[in-house]
């Protein structure tokens, strides 16, 4: 047991990044990170979860890369190992069969037929397997190869296709799809097209998804590798259907499979998510309290966590807050927009932290759903507190808007009063409105002085010295006094012409 464990660890240390990612993905582990992180993660996996299945996967990966060395290791294995792992095609020592050796040197073992498993897709539910994963075998050394596969439809399968509803005109919800993936590695495989691919169904070429244009300079366009719908070109009867695949042979091995599937829409997936994966608000509060719990060993105490109510995908207010169970953040994204975007361009990546976000791990935040119903539309951010409660966060613009709309002003009020009949302004406004009170008193200044009433003298500051000297005659003063009692005297400037006749440009 110890010798096998050491052997498996040595094999893991010689793996490439792609081999490490395949091994970790086959065992349900994260395959992101640098090579040293992947190696450490794979070694811990071998040490902590050692099993015959894991050892088989490690050996198959190693034999794929080092076929000669794996044959030599297979010849050195004891009989017990060969009995426990017959699928490796390794011959035990001491059998005495001459076919296992050639001139005293053990023959290299043929490459194992790896069991290919395709990753399940949320929008495609497998009903039946029409053609299991089959390797595309090159017939010659030409770069452009052609492979053919055949399959038949049963009457029940034909009825399922014909009686299914339409997603849109001409597209049924029950389809026959073709999927292609790598064969070089083991474990669960994602869809991957070979270069120069072309698919012909019953002598008619079918559509294969093209490349996504890239907005970044110097970045090659990316091709979406999704199942190919071949239903419109099939014989919906018991007649045999033939599929011809043209592909480029550039050293990598591929496998092809055909499935009968039911296609879901983003709305149907959202209904599944809404009925099966909603996190209880009390559980959300417990998680918030755990994050904000005081740590005596930490020098920094967190008193609150701010969460935006704006979806990072579409920059709009959240409708259905959703997040991934494996993510550490509390920030959510809108579930409806997330499913719609993955329906058009499947990436299944968290828009907050860019980590994998498979549909099986999505959940609706029940607490944030209640908060969205209680808060007005203008609130764009909230803060979770240590006791699990929350409070809205308003920015400076909203505070200023509320201050303007409030009835109680924050600044002193200045009263502008009308002068009294005797030409004097009120005492409380004389200091604030000096110019206005003085000019207002000037309109009745002559009348107040001639009448001999009590009070201070009001001086018209708009008149200059020359105007006072011109009007100095006694008879003229009495006439002007009589006129001023009937109507206010017009202000006189230092110009002889009438100001009303001057045109302003």
Swiss-Prot record:
<feature type="zinc finger region" description="SP-RING-type">
    <location>
        <begin position="296"/>
        <end position="381"/>
    </location>
</feature>
<feature type="region of interest" description="Disordered">
    <location>
        <begin position="395"/>
        <end position="505"/>
    </location>
</feature>
<keyword id="KW-0833">Ubl conjugation pathway</keyword>
<keyword id="KW-0808">Transferase</keyword>
<keyword id="KW-0479">Metal-binding</keyword>
<dbReference type="GO" id="GO:1905168">
    <property type="term" value="P:positive regulation of double-strand break repair via homologous recombination"/>
</dbReference>
<comment type="function">
    <text>Functions as an E3-type small ubiquitin-like modifier (SUMO) ligase. May play a role as a transcriptional coregulator in various cellular pathways. Catalyzes conjugation of SUMO2 to KAT5 in response to DNA damage, facilitating repair of DNA double-strand breaks (DSBs) via homologous recombination (HR). Mediates sumoylation of PARP1 in response to PARP1 trapping to chromatin. Negatively regulates induction of interferon phi 1 (ifnphi1) mediated by mavs and ticam1/trif.</text>
</comment>
<dbReference type="InterPro" id="IPR036361">
    <property type="entry name" value="SAP_dom_sf"/>
</dbReference>
<feature type="domain" description="PINIT">
    <location>
        <begin position="104"/>
        <end position="264"/>
    </location>
</feature>
<feature type="binding site">
    <location>
        <position position="353"/>
    </location>
    <ligand>
        <name>Zn(2+)</name>
    </ligand>
</feature>
<dbReference type="GO" id="GO:0016925">
    <property type="term" value="P:protein sumoylation"/>
</dbReference>
<dbReference type="InterPro" id="IPR023321">
    <property type="entry name" value="PINIT"/>
</dbReference>
<feature type="short sequence motif" description="LXXLL motif">
    <location>
        <begin position="20"/>
        <end position="24"/>
    </location>
</feature>
<dbReference type="InterPro" id="IPR004181">
    <property type="entry name" value="Znf_MIZ"/>
</dbReference>
<feature type="compositionally biased region" description="Acidic residues">
    <location>
        <begin position="462"/>
        <end position="485"/>
    </location>
</feature>
<keyword id="KW-0539">Nucleus</keyword>
<feature type="compositionally biased region" description="Basic and acidic residues">
    <location>
        <begin position="493"/>
        <end position="505"/>
    </location>
</feature>
<dbReference type="GO" id="GO:0000785">
    <property type="term" value="C:chromatin"/>
</dbReference>
<dbReference type="GO" id="GO:0032480">
    <property type="term" value="P:negative regulation of type I interferon production"/>
</dbReference>
<feature type="cross-link" description="Glycyl lysine isopeptide (Lys-Gly) (interchain with G-Cter in SUMO); alternate">
    <location>
        <position position="35"/>
    </location>
</feature>
<feature type="compositionally biased region" description="Basic and acidic residues">
    <location>
        <begin position="395"/>
        <end position="407"/>
    </location>
</feature>
<dbReference type="InterPro" id="IPR038654">
    <property type="entry name" value="PINIT_sf"/>
</dbReference>
<dbReference type="InterPro" id="IPR003034">
    <property type="entry name" value="SAP_dom"/>
</dbReference>
<keyword id="KW-0238">DNA-binding</keyword>
<feature type="cross-link" description="Glycyl lysine isopeptide (Lys-Gly) (interchain with G-Cter in SUMO2)">
    <location>
        <position position="56"/>
    </location>
</feature>
<dbReference type="GO" id="GO:0061665">
    <property type="term" value="F:SUMO ligase activity"/>
</dbReference>
<dbReference type="Pfam" id="PF14324">
    <property type="entry name" value="PINIT"/>
</dbReference>
<keyword id="KW-0862">Zinc</keyword>
<dbReference type="Pfam" id="PF02891">
    <property type="entry name" value="zf-MIZ"/>
</dbReference>
<keyword id="KW-0804">Transcription</keyword>
<feature type="compositionally biased region" description="Gly residues">
    <location>
        <begin position="437"/>
        <end position="457"/>
    </location>
</feature>
<feature type="region of interest" description="Required for nuclear localization">
    <location>
        <begin position="374"/>
        <end position="505"/>
    </location>
</feature>
<keyword id="KW-0863">Zinc-finger</keyword>
<dbReference type="GO" id="GO:0006357">
    <property type="term" value="P:regulation of transcription by RNA polymerase II"/>
</dbReference>
<feature type="binding site">
    <location>
        <position position="329"/>
    </location>
    <ligand>
        <name>Zn(2+)</name>
    </ligand>
</feature>
<protein>
    <recommendedName>
        <fullName>E3 SUMO-protein ligase PIAS4-A</fullName>
        <ecNumber>2.3.2.27</ecNumber>
    </recommendedName>
</protein>
<dbReference type="GO" id="GO:0060339">
    <property type="term" value="P:negative regulation of type I interferon-mediated signaling pathway"/>
</dbReference>
<dbReference type="GO" id="GO:0008270">
    <property type="term" value="F:zinc ion binding"/>
</dbReference>
<feature type="cross-link" description="Glycyl lysine isopeptide (Lys-Gly) (interchain with G-Cter in SUMO2)">
    <location>
        <position position="68"/>
    </location>
</feature>
<keyword id="KW-0832">Ubl conjugation</keyword>
<feature type="cross-link" description="Glycyl lysine isopeptide (Lys-Gly) (interchain with G-Cter in SUMO2); alternate">
    <location>
        <position position="35"/>
    </location>
</feature>
<dbReference type="GO" id="GO:0003677">
    <property type="term" value="F:DNA binding"/>
</dbReference>
């Amino acid at each position: 047991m110890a010798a096998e464990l050491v052997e498996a660890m040595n094999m893991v240390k010689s793996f490439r990044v792609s081999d490490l990612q395949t091994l970790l993905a086959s065992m349900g582990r994260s395959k992101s990170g640098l090579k040293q992180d992947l190696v450490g993660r794979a070694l811990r996996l071998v040490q902590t979860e050692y099993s015959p299945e894991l050892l088989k996967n490690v050996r198959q990966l190693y034999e794929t890369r080092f076929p000669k060395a794996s044959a030599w290791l297979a010849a050195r294995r004891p009989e017990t190992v060969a009995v426990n792992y017959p699928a490796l095609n390794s011959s035990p020592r001491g059998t005495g069969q001459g076919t296992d050796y050639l001139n005293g040197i053990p023959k290299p073992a043929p490459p194992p037929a790896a069991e290919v498993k395709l990753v399940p897709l949320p929008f495609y539910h497998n009903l039946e397997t029409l053609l299991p994963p089959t390797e595309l075998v090159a017939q010659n050394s030409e770069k452009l190869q052609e492979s053919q596969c055949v399959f038949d439809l049963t009457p029940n399968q034909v009825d399922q296709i014909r009686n299914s509803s339409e997603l849109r005109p001409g597209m049924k919800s029950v389809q026959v799809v073709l999927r292609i993936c790598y064969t070089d590695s083991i474990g669960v495989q994602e869809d991957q097209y070979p270069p120069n691919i072309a698919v012909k169904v019953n002598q008619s070429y079918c559509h294969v998804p093209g490349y996504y244009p890239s907005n970044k300079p110097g970045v090659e366009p990316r091709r979406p590798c999704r199942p190919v719908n071949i239903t419109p070109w099939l014989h919906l009867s018991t007649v045999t259907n033939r599929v011809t695949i043209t592909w480029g042979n550039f050293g990598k091995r591929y496998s092809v499979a055909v499935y009968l599937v039911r296609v879901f829409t983003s709305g149907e997936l959202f209904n599944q998510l809404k009925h099966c994966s909603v996190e209880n608000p009390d559980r959300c509060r417990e998680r918030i309290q755990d994050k904000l719990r005081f740590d005596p060993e930490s020098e920094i105490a967190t008193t609150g966590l701010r969460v935006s109510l704006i979806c990072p995908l579409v920059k709009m207010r959240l409708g259905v807050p959703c997040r991934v169970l494996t993510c550490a953040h509390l920030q959510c994204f809108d579930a409806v927009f997330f499913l719609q975007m993955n329906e058009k361009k499947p990436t299944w990546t968290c828009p907050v932290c860019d980590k994998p976000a498979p549909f099986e791990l999505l959940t609706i935040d029940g607490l944030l759903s209640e908060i969205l119903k209680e808060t007005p539309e203008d609130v764009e951010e909230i803060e979770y507190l240590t006791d699990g409660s929350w409070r809205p966060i308003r920015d400076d613009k909203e505070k200023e808007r509320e201050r303007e709309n409030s009835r109680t002003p924050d600044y002193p009020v200045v009263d502008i009063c009308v002068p009294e009949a005797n030409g004097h302004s009120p005492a409380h406004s004389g200091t604030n409105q000096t110019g206005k009170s003085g000019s207002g008193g000037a309109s009745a200044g002559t009348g107040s002085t001639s009448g001999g009433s009590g009070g201070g003298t009001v001086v018209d500051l708009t008149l200059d010295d020359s105007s006072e000297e011109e009007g100095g005659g006694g008879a003229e003063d009495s006439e002007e006094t009589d006129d001023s009692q009937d109507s206010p005297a017009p202000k006189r400037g230092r110009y002889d012409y009438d100001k009303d006749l001057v045109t302003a440009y």
